[in-house]
């Protein structure tokens, strides 16, 4: 069996064109473009690279971008004050708190300080709760990107058994909610799951998001399964692989996302889509 390649780069290009047009229409109506701000405490090479990629994405669709950098020694009160200032600024529509934070800072406290209407990472408890209840919410970008790929390739989820490997608030949990909303039967696996391979083999849809290179192999998959690989693992200088062993899994799956080039390129487009959604919502309330 030769698996269908779920091409994230192609979808990202399509989404970029759509968002760019919608952003231009928004600016024509309101007189301003959606504005995104990233709040970063200190930083490292990986964090700085990601911030630059967000800047390029914003510039590519005509959105405004700003970076607010705080010293590495910042305390919780300083961080939350910066977040609250951006939350209260009517010229800012989307806010990202760049993770990870230094050890003296609470990520939960920082996220809670956000205006949930500007929480374009979809991590605020209000957005998580609204998603769980099936209400309109800003959804975390990575799982939203995975769902967009399934939609792009018209993969039906109703009545299918979806196995999600990973239970983070960023990917695993929200992805399970999104799949459930599309009438899939969902199983979430994690580090304490007994007989992991047996559970994965039950999945018509398998999503891996644990940060362990090659954890899911072809032997674990039901023949014909659809595989979403959210893993990004650097195993050698310049070599990135996913949580799924591509060589074996691509021979068993009916469709699979590559790494790189699968879910990753769509993630930034979902961030832009959330920023546009937030700007539109705030404009309606003004």
Curated annotation (Swiss-Prot):
Pathway named in the protein's UniProt entry: One-carbon metabolism; tetrahydrofolate interconversion
CDD domains: NAD_bind_m-THF_DH_Cyclohyd
Molecular function, one GO term: methylenetetrahydrofolate dehydrogenase (NADP+) activity
Entry's Gene Ontology BP terms: L-histidine biosynthetic process; methionine biosynthetic process; purine nucleotide biosynthetic process; tetrahydrofolate interconversion
UniProt keyword Phosphoprotein present: no
E.C. number: 1.5.1.5, 3.5.4.9
Keywords for this protein: Amino-acid biosynthesis, Histidine biosynthesis, Hydrolase, Methionine biosynthesis, Multifunctional enzyme, NADP, One-carbon metabolism, Oxidoreductase, Purine biosynthesis
Domain of life of the source: Bacteria
Assigned GO CC terms: cytosol
Binding sites annotated in the UniProt record for NADP(+): 166-168, 191, 232
Database matches in Gene3D superfamilies: Leucine Dehydrogenase, chain A, domain 1, NAD(P)-binding Rossmann-like Domain
Short name of any one Pfam family annotated for the protein: THF_DHG_CYH_C
SUPFAM superfamilies: Aminoacid dehydrogenase-like, N-terminal domain, NAD(P)-binding Rossmann-fold domains
Bilayer-spanning residue ranges: none
Substrates-to-products reaction catalysed: (6R)-5,10-methylene-5,6,7,8-tetrahydrofolate + NADP(+) = (6R)-5,10-methenyltetrahydrofolate + NADPH; (6R)-5,10-methenyltetrahydrofolate + H2O = (6R)-10-formyltetrahydrofolate + H(+)
Keyword flag Amino-acid biosynthesis: yes
Functional description taken from the UniProt entry: Catalyzes the oxidation of 5,10-methylenetetrahydrofolate to 5,10-methenyltetrahydrofolate and then the hydrolysis of 5,10-methenyltetrahydrofolate to 10-formyltetrahydrofolate.
Subunit structure: Homodimer.
Family statement: Belongs to the tetrahydrofolate dehydrogenase/cyclohydrolase family.
Name under which the protein is recorded: Bifunctional protein FolD
Organism, scientific name: Herpetosiphon aurantiacus (strain ATCC 23779 / DSM 785 / 114-95)
Organism classification: Bacteria, Bacillati, Chloroflexota, Chloroflexia, Herpetosiphonales
The encoding gene: folD
């Amino acid at each position: 069996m030769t698996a269908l390649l779920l091409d994230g780069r192609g979808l990202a290009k399509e989404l970029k064109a759509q968002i760019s047009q919608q952003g231009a229409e928004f600016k024509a109506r309101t007189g301003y473009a959606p504005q995104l701000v990233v709040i970063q405490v200190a930083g490292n090479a990986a964090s700085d690279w990601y911030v630059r990629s967000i800047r390029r994405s914003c510039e590519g669709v005509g959105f405004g971008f700003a970076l607010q950098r705080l010293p590495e020694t910042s305390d919780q009160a300083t961080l939350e004050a910066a977040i609250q200032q951006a939350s209260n600024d009517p010229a800012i529509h989307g806010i990202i708190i760049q993770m990870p934070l230094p050890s003296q800072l609470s990520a939960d406290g920082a996220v809670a300080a956000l205006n949930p209407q500007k929480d374009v990472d979809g991590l605020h408890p209000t957005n998580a709760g609204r998603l769980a209840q099936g209400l309109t919410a800003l959804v975390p970008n990575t799982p939203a990107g995975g769902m967009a790929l399934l939609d792009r390739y018209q993969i039906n989820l109703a009545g299918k058994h979806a196995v999600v490997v990973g239970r983070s608030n960023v990917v695993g949990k929200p992805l399970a909610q999104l799949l459930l909303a599309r009438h899939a039967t969902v199983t979430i696996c994690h580090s304490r799951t007994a007989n992991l391979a047996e559970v994965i083999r039950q999945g018509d849809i398998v999503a891996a998001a644990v940060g362990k290179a090659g954890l899911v192999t072809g032997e674990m998959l039901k023949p014909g399964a659809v595989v979403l690989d959210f893993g990004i693992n650097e195993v050698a200088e310049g070599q990135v692989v996913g949580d799924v062993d591509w060589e074996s899994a691509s021979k068993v799956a009916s469709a699979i996302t590559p790494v790189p080039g699968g879910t990753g390129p769509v993630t930034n487009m979902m961030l832009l889509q959330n920023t546009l959604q937030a700007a539109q919502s705030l404009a309606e309330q003004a």
